Amino acid sequence: MVENSELRKAGLKVTLPRVKILQMLDSAEQRHMSAEDVYKALMEAGEDVGLATVYRVLTQFEAAGLVVRHNFDGGHAVFELADSGHHDHMVCVDTGEVIEFMDAEIEKRQKEIVRERGFELVDHNLVLYVRKKK
């Protein structure tokens, strides 16, 4: 469960909309949510937070390092809490479902490729676009 101290630690004032949105992201079954997804979930929970507020708060959370924004091809921005460790993503081209995965071999090979070419890996983002086999 997220705490108000996380907002303060990120340099943000504790407000009811920020708390509600952070709690929604933390408790949601779906880890990657668009601003519209967050808004709909808040409405379904009976929370009175406007869509413009959701967009503004998510942007503030991103700037503060509380969430990570992903702009997967063919879709709008989705957000996930920044508390999870490194992982990569698969995005289903038919449904838009986002699946997280971590593969030590892929991570190792990426570092080798970079090193072989005389570079140091600073960061990376691997997204595989997939479709269920029929």
Curated annotation (Swiss-Prot):
Region: DNA-binding, residue numbers: 1-83
One record GO biological process: siderophore biosynthetic process
Bridged cysteine pairs (disulfide): none
Region named Dimerization: 84-134
Record InterPro entries: FUR, Fur_C, WH-like_DNA-bd_sf, WH_DNA-bd_sf
Role played: Fur acts as a repressor, employing Fe(2+) as a cofactor to bind the operator of the iron transport operon. Involved in exotoxin A regulation, siderophore regulation and manganese susceptibility.
Family the UniProt entry places it in: Belongs to the Fur family.
Name of the molecule in the record: Ferric uptake regulation protein
Species in which this protein is naturally found: Pseudomonas aeruginosa (strain ATCC 15692 / DSM 22644 / CIP 104116 / JCM 14847 / LMG 12228 / 1C / PRS 101 / PAO1)
The gene coding this protein: fur
